[in-house]
């Protein structure tokens, strides 16, 4: 575990005093904005979705004493209800735990529910439905239960809502709610449930038509419902007296006489917020995907209500109150569904009942939650329009702007700028091609020239070609823009602290290329980095106060938890659970849980002691199969001293994440010569599609070679494929290092010798989608006996007795043969992890004979066991005779913990 040294010094000076934890809130919250306390009975902590707790025992002053109290693997726990059954080995879940009266409730990886004693980690009960014992199965992905009225509310297979006795897990009732005349309410499977005052508020996800709806907590009977796609004849009047013909916003009826609204999706797939004082519940509705696709708006002219809108309803009746649409006529699949955050804040010297409506488009609309009007101003911006898309002429932006750049950053290529701006664009998209010095310059002709007759540019856009900006229009060919359907905060909760008056947003960055032929999420260019962080926004001004861009995407369920001691806890896709200073965003504390985290933390108090808990279970978005799934429920407290099998409190570091979008899997064939790549072919056969624009149209997609290999890039002409040659010129534009950029006519080839290990992506200039990768590997040259650690005994004992506070450096010395020049990349391999750990410092002695490297004990202690002869391997790159070599040596070291 890594602790900020300044904080450590403060704590040591303060000693181990343990302040009394303050609490008092009941499980059934009675107001929107009362902070959660010893209980957090719903995802988002309170009815306002603030993800904030008034608990303050764990603070910046004693953070170095925060250690693991216990860890429970929830899947192997046997089920107790509705009938005894064995545990499972399932992993992976997006749920955030909730807690009431010291008991943690959460969805298990296989979709059941478990109750765990918050003090000990011992399971109290576990509910796992099966077709054999209940007549239905669980759902898979779940995002949270809620607790109230003595029950735990969850979802199950077959569009079921289930109530369980919170003390025993016994089924109280099961319902299958339907809409008017038995109509489907959508796919009832993922959305976290919200309980308030005898009602459960729910939403449909992923179906053709989805509704927000409420059922009674006593028996699951439907009380009201409201569909996201407004059918013909739906006319409403809001609290401001404005009448809207919502059904008319979908254009004319189809040839079959039906409205596009009836198959539009428009899912309320994230849990709502509730204001009991105003008697309103606030839902957000997502993207439109009917009459074409989510990337094609040509068949549904109009604003398409209630797509990408926040809508306020009467709590009891579901009567429409007001709405605010963030994106008109969405054909980018921006899917602005986020839990609305409510707060009472001072704006312009007056107390306002605010609603914060954030978005994947990286902007926050600050609204008056009594009437839906903007509190800080909205501007309408004209965007480039493709006449075929039936686009809205303007789109809404907060007057304060976005918290991301509005356009893609077209940074120059070069080895000195890796990885570069988080918002940098992959070359060749939108016509931005590298010039002779690697600058990305808009160049004609390019693949988007065919759109010119249909695209118009408003004067305020400042260009007559696409810049890669928010809401740039598209048609059949990919147009790269920011942000992304998988960027912004995606489904992560936001947070709010009344102490700091900051609104917190965990985000991801993943530029996306839109065209009508892409799937729902568009095309995230292969090879671009997938990163993210947390941004804090002044709740009174909507201005960014700080940003911590820590390089990992936290847009996918990694909800922040803020406490009244001004700490912000958040889980990471690499398994780390971190604490940040909520005032300035600095990281203060870090713990390795052993599995990817796609969940929010929860805090609670038992017997006057504060705990923080997190589920490390994992999800594949956006890092795919490189993530490590799990089923690990962790709890932390001051003085926690839980230890794993290695003798450390942390689990070993999971396998490294694939931070760049992966290439396809097109393999070579017998017709492809060794160390050769064929450009723009669907595969390596003579009958392949020539001049292919598929993403996998570099053959092979991945070519792995040793350092020093010369690779040939060939645009196959008649000599290679006599009856089916490529007819167009094609490029191999290497990015982001900019090592080469040949443009080859059919039959031409280019060679490049790779002298250093690494991953080298490249794509085509004729159409930017075909992308490949050359993986250059160093062949380790073993140096027996050349490595030693100083001193010979490696102590991993923490100074304060709490094992999460291991600090200091481990020093290694590697003897180097004559004629080798140091070339960097010093790494340590440990027995318990496949991750290689970088050196903190690495220097050569003045005679060039010895490499001295140091490694952070906080990163490596959990990745090695105790023992008298623990094998540790150091590798480093050196140049010899103009070729990079990887030297490696092993030392058996005594490790004590």
Residue ranges and their predicted role:
Residues 602-657:
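Blade-level signature of beta-propeller repeat domains, shared across WD40, Kelch, NHL, RCC1
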Residues 72-98, 126-146, 171-194, 225-271, ...:
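Extracytoplasmic beta-rich repeat domains
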Residues 507-511, 526-586:
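Loop/turn-rich, solvent-exposed surfaces of beta-rich toroidal or solenoidal domains
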Residues 37-44, 88-112, 136-161, 185-212, ...:
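Repeat-blade elements of multi-bladed beta-propeller folds
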Residues 117-120, 165-168, 216-219, 315-317, ...:
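Short loop/turn segments that connect beta-strands within beta-propeller blades
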Residues 659-780:
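Extracytoplasmic copper-binding redox domains, predominantly the cupredoxin/blue-copper superfamily
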Residues 23-35, 659, 664-682, 779-810, ...:
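Boundary/junction segments of secreted and surface-exposed precursor proteins
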């Amino acid at each position: 575990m890594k602790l900020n040294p300044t904080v450590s010094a403060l704590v040591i000076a303060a000693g181990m005093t343990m302040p009394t934890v303050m609490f008092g809130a009941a499980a059934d919250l009675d107001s929107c904005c009362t902070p959660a306390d010893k209980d957090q009975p719903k995802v988002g902590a309170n009815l306002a979705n603030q993800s904030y707790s008034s608990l303050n025992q764990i603070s910046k002053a004693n953070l170095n004493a925060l250690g693991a109290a216990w860890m429970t693997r929830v899947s192997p726990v046997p089920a107790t209800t509705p009938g005894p059954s064995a545990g499972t080995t399932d992993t992976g879940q997006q749920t955030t735990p909730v807690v009431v009266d010291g008991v943690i409730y959460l969805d298990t990886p296989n979709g059941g529910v478990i109750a765990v004693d918050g003090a000990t980690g011992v399971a109290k009960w576990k509910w796992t439905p099966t077709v054999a014992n209940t007549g239905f199965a669980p759902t898979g992905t779940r995002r949270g239960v809620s607790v109230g009225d003595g029950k735990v509310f969850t979802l199950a297979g077959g569009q079921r809502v289930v109530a369980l006795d919170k003390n025993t897990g016994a089924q109280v009732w099961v319902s299958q709610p339907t809409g008017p005349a038995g109509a489907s309410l959508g796919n009832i499977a993922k959305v976290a449930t919200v309980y308030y005052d005898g009602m459960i508020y729910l939403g449909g996800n992923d179906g053709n038509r989805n509704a927000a709806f409420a059922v009674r907590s006593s028996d699951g009977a439907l009380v009201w419902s409201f569909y996201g796609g407004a059918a013909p004849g739906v006319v409403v009047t809001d609290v401001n007296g404005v009448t809207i013909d919502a059904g008319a916003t979908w254009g004319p009826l189809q040839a079959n006489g039906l409205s596009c609204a009836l198959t539009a999706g428009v899912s309320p797939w994230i849990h709502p917020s509730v204001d009991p004082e105003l008697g309103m519940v606030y839902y957000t509705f997502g993207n439109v995907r009917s009459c074409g696709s989510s990337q094609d708006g040509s068949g549904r002219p109009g604003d398409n209500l209630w797509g990408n809108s926040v809508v306020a309803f009467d709590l009891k009746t579901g009567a429409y109150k007001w709405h605010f649409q963030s994106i008109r006529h969405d054909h980018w699949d921006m899917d602005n569904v986020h839990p609305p955050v409510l707060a009472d804040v001072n704006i312009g010297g007056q107390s306002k009942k605010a609603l914060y409506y954030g978005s994947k488009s990286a902007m926050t609309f600050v609204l008056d939650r009594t009437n839906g009007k903007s509190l800080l101003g909205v501007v309408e911006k004209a965007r480039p329009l493709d006449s075929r898309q039936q686009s809205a002429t303007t789109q809404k932006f907060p007057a304060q702007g976005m918290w991301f750049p509005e356009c893609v950053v077209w940074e120059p290529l070069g080895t000195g700028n890796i990885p570069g701006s988080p918002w940098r664009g992959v070359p060749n998209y939108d016509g931005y091609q590298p010039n002779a010095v690697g600058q990305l310059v808009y160049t004609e002709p390019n693949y988007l020239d065919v759109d010119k007759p249909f695209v118009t540019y408003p004067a305020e856009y400042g260009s007559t070609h696409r810049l890669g900006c928010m809401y740039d229009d598209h048609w059949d060919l990919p147009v790269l823009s920011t942000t992304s359907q998988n960027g912004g905060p995606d489904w992560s909760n936001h947070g709010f602290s009344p102490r700091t008056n900051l609104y917190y947003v965990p985000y991801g960055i993943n530029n996306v290329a839109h065209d009508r032929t892409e799937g729902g999420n568009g095309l995230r260019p292969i090879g671009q980095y997938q990163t993210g962080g947390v941004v804090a926004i002044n709740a009174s001004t909507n201005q960014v106060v700080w940003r911590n861009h820590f390089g990992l995407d936290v847009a996918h369920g990694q909800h922040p938890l803020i406490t009244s001691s001004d700490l912000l806890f958040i889980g990471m896709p690499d398994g780390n659970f971190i604490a940040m200073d909520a005032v300035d965003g600095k990281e203060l504390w870090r713990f390795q849980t052993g599995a990817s985290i796609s969940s929010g933390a929860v805090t609670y108090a038992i017997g006057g002691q504060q705990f923080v808990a997190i589920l490390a279970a994992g999800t594949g978005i956006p890092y795919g199969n490189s993530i490590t799934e799990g089923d690990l429920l962790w709890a932390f407290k001051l003085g926690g001293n839980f230890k794993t099998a290695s003798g450390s409190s942390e689990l070993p570091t999971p396998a490294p994440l694939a931070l760049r979008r992966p290439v396809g899997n097109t393999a070579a064939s017998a017709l492809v010569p060794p160390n050769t790549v064929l450009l723009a072919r669907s595969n390596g056969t003579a009958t392949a599609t020539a001049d292919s624009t598929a993403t996998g149209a570099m053959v092979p997609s991945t070519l792995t070679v040793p350092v020093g290999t010369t690779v040939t890039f060939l645009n196959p002409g008649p000599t290679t494929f006599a009856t089916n040659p490529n007819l167009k010129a094609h490029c191999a534009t290497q990015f982001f290092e900019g090592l080469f950029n040949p443009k080859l006519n059919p039959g031409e080839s280019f060679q490049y010798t790779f002298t250093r290990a690494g991953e080298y992506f490249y794509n085509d200039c004729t159409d930017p989608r075909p992308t490949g990768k050359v993986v250059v590997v160093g062949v380790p040259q073993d140096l027996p006996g050349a490595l030693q650690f100083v001193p010979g005994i490696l102590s991993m004992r923490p100074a304060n007795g709490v094992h999460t506070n291991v600090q200091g450096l481990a020093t290694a010395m590697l003897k180097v043969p004559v004629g080798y020049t140091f070339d960097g990349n010093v790494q340590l391999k440990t027995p318990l992890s496949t991750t290689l750990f970088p050196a903190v410092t690495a220097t050569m002695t003045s005679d060039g004979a010895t490499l001295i490297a140091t490694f952070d004990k906080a990163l490596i202690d959990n990745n090695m066991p105790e023992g008298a002869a623990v094998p540790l391997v150091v590798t480093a790159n050196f140049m010899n005779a103009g070729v990079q070599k990887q030297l490696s040596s092993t030392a058996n070291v005594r490790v004590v913990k």
